[in-house]
């Protein structure tokens, strides 16, 4: 199972506003449900069957906001609940690894190539920061097929031309 959900509303922060003054509570609540409640509910449905089978993979697709918050980047600032996704992956790793279930948090620290992404000013100015979705899928497949003797529980994918978020 790959949990990969996002939310686009509320990404534009006017220069004269601060996040708390601009962001309606309803937008935050939707983002929080997607980033914290969503993966919990999917895991609650999927992991017991994986535990019973003694095998399975649960991968959480995350972003750099799970590692640190950033000022004035609304889309990422809004997603600080993604820290909860990372914590959930860590807890599920502790609980389910011994039952043969591989859980990992995958941090996609960049822009994923798509027509919409290519239209963004940042992607047009620096095309090398755009990540190939096929290569991202390859990384997910690599995690899924890893030998149990050396599972990866967190993987950060970053374009070569940028510094990884920490």
Where are these regions (language model features)?
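Conserved NAD(P)H cofactor-binding loop of Rossmann-fold oxidoreductase domains
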Residues: 4-15
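Catalytic loop of short-chain dehydrogenase/reductase
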Residues: 7, 23-27, 31, 57-84, ...
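PG/GG-rich flexible active-site loop of Rossmann-like NAD(P)H-dependent oxidoreductases
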Residues: 9, 63-66, 105-113
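Active-site loop of short-chain dehydrogenase/reductase
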Residues: 12, 50-63, 98-101
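Short glycine/proline- and charge-enriched loop/turn segments
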Residues: 22-23, 75, 116-125
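A short, exposed helix-loop element centered on a Lys and neighboring polar residues
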Residues: 43-44
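C-terminal helical subdomain
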Residues: 98-107, 113, 121-166
């Amino acid at each position: 199972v790959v949990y990969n959900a996002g939310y686009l509303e509320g990404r534009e922060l006017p220069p004269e506003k601060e996040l708390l003054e601009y962001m309606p509570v309803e937008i935050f609540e939707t983002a929080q449900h997607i980033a914290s409640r969503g993966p919990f509910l999917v895991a609650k449905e999927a992991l017991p069957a994986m535990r019973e089978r003694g095998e399975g993979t649960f991968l959480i697709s995350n972003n750099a906001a799970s590692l640190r918050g950033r000022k004035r980047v609304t889309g990422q600032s809004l997603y600080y609940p993604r820290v909860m996704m990372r914590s959930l992956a860590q807890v599920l790793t502790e609980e389910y690894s011994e039952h043969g279930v591989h859980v990992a948090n995958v941090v996609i620290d960049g822009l994923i190539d798509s027509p919409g992404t290519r239209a963004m000013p940042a992607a047009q100015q620096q095309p090398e920061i755009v990540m190939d979705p096929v290569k991202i899928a390859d990384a997910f497949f690599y995690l899924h097929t890893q030998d149990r003797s050396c599972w990866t529980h967190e993987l950060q994918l970053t374009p070569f031309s940028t510094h990884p978020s920490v």
